[in-house]
Amino acid sequence: MLPGVRDHDGMDTRFVGIPEVGEAPAVAVVVDVMRAFTVAAWAFARGAEKIVLAGSLDEALALKERDPARVALKDGPLTPGFDLVNSPGLLRSADLAGRTVVQKTTAGTVGALAVRDASLVLCAGFVVAEATARVLRARAPEHVTFVVTGEDGRADEDLACARYIARRAAGHDADAAGFLGRAAESRAATELVQGVRQGVHPDDVALCLELDRFPFAMVAAPEDSLMVLRPCAVPRP
């Protein structure tokens, strides 16, 4: 487990990988910068009403089969039954007005499902960092668990984003350039740029590092038997 930090205002922050989540925290911020929650934010910006976070590819396909109007997306190359891939560059031109998206990714959706019993689950990346921090400042929880989804909690881009949001949530100034620089030099960014992964657009890394591109936060909560992500409007101070 990565070390916890208590800031001078009293917010206790814990940074963990998915395997270390354990008992459901009261408040969880699930971070996946490259690319699940950057993609989710873009989906909402393109008009999606909600995103169902699927636990497996089979579940995603079953949800799509149950309602063919749903838009199913996944990591990697496009495969039968899916409509889109987990790429902000490829998704940013999609018309998702009023649609329900079903998302299954390697890390982000897994992390959100791991904390589904938390009283508040925020899903985040740099594109919604300040909005996420404002929700935390408004709620002023005593304890916040940041789930660093990539590389079992060691992904530089996710940890940088989590620590940035934690500082902003505590009301501290933060050198955004330093945090973004760490993310830009991460293994995930390198693999995306070098074409190691499939289902990638050349602009993906740049889009994932657009700080505060969107004014909303993203809140996941159980609805019936599903974990559903929705945008949450956050008034600017």
Curated annotation (Swiss-Prot):
EC assignment: 3.1.3.71
Keywords, alphabetical: Hydrolase, Magnesium
InterPro entries per record: ComB-like, ComB-like_sf
Enzyme's top EC category: hydrolase
Cofactor(s) essential for the protein: Mg(2+)
Domain of life: Bacteria
Gene3D superfamilies membership: ComB-like
GO molecular function: 2-phosphosulfolactate phosphatase activity; magnesium ion binding; sulfopyruvate decarboxylase activity
Magnesium among keywords: yes
Keyword Endoplasmic reticulum attached: no
Reactions mediated catalytically: (2R)-O-phospho-3-sulfolactate + H2O = (2R)-3-sulfolactate + phosphate
Family that this chain belongs to: Belongs to the ComB family.
HAMAP family hit by this protein: ComB
Protein name per the record: Probable 2-phosphosulfolactate phosphatase
Species of the source: Streptomyces coelicolor (strain ATCC BAA-471 / A3(2) / M145)
